[in-house]
């Protein structure tokens, strides 16, 4: 009786692994996802891993799962990097193989555990040269050990990637990771993938779209965990508390970002000027200084801005909206920073002090103007006669000598 495809005895089928159902994002792709999409990805990957474990497939916990459980960003994980004095990462077995211990002993433990019933004769060792062909060796466990032992030194000197596969289809799938070819395309959104399993995983997102709805505001969500987190907006729940200052937050990711205030950590560095930032979004905004990009355009007058917040403030010029009101005198402003400066009039606060003479000022701009008395700086120059002045008002008065203008009339 012939065995049907997929039966336990079929050598073509192989074992399902976490690598078959995982989706990996680059830094650029991860930053394109919004908060809800990142949470959905996190939930789907964790659920996939739990499903594999529940099916009795013995897989050790991948670094990606550990990272997601700790609410870290998954693109931080470096895969398939093999450099001097670093362990070889056999991602198919999800086990580190330290060079000083030797690969032979490690494989003798791993292979029987992972491929015990299929036998060693079915194993193939491939030395994958990035963007190139693969060298194949078939045979028993001795040949496997010999192949890896002879190539061990080369592994740490080149950018080759050594992987062990239980079937030829797995090795072909692995090659696509090096070539970068994406043959599988989503018909709905047009996004392409290297592997059909990744496309299937992506399509699950479509089937889950808007399955869960908030009873409070009616907003739809793709998964129940995202809905549960959303409900905190209505309940005001803030389960994540900073151990340093006691401040509480609705999201764990917000707490992670907040902690950098205390630690001073700035993990995001501008490649152009070397300036570092605590948030990736701040770095993205900063980069526009170098590129000159202004993606936010006013529909009313066509003026463009590099920051969305700048566009929001600008729009109030057209609408006349002034959402920030002074509690002391009732005067309204279109910008929170303008209200903050205005409040100083009522409090009498003068936080900006001149180091030269000790005189204090309410505004930083007034202090900067005052400093010119000490420095002698005269930044305002007359185009007519080249005479320079410390203040713009002095230049304006001077210009009337050339124009003959007499703006002040006796009533």
From Swiss-Prot:
GO CC terms of this entry: nucleus
Principal location: nucleus
Protein name: Zinc finger protein 679
Membrane-spanning residues: none
Designated gene of the protein: ZNF679
Domain named KRAB: residues: 16-87
Pfam families in the cross-refs: KRAB, zf-C2H2, zf-C2H2_4
InterPro entries referenced in this protein's UniProt entry, alphabetically: KRAB, KRAB_dom_sf, Snail/Krueppel_Znf, Znf_C2H2_sf, Znf_C2H2_type
Compartment annotation: Nucleus
Keywords: DNA-binding, Metal-binding, Nucleus, Repeat, Transcription, Transcription regulation, Zinc, Zinc-finger
Keyword Coiled coil: no
